[in-house]
């Protein structure tokens, strides 16, 4: 039962982590583009 619970947590965290990295990279790109770098 604990394995299933941990598996569910991992499946829940992976999309959130990927989304966070994507948003961070996008904001860095927009910031650099705005500064003309």
Swiss-Prot record:
InterPro entries: Cyt_6/f_cplx_su5, Cyt_6/f_cplx_su5_sf. GO terms for molecular function: electron transporter, transferring electrons within cytochrome b6/f complex of photosystem II activity. It is found in: Plastid, Chloroplast thylakoid membrane. It is a single-pass membrane protein. Keywords: Chloroplast, Electron transport, Membrane, Photosynthesis, Plastid, Thylakoid, Transmembrane, Transmembrane helix, Transport. The chain crosses the membrane at residues 5-25. GO terms for biological process: cytochrome complex assembly; photosynthesis. The keyword Membrane applies. It holds the Pfam family PetG. GO terms for cellular component: chloroplast thylakoid membrane; cytochrome b6f complex. Belongs to the PetG family. The 4 large subunits of the cytochrome b6-f complex are cytochrome b6, subunit IV (17 kDa polypeptide, PetD), cytochrome f and the Rieske protein, while the 4 small subunits are PetG, PetL, PetM and PetN. The complex functions as a dimer. Component of the cytochrome b6-f complex, which mediates electron transfer between photosystem II (PSII) and photosystem I (PSI), cyclic electron flow around PSI, and state transitions. PetG is required for either the stability or assembly of the cytochrome b6-f complex. NCBIfam families: PRK00665.1. This is Cytochrome b6-f complex subunit 5. The gene is petG.
């Amino acid at each position: 039962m604990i394995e299933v619970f941990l598996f569910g947590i991992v499946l829940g965290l992976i999309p959130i982590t990927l989304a966070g990295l994507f948003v961070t990279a996008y904001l860095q790109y927009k910031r650099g583009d705005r500064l003309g770098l």
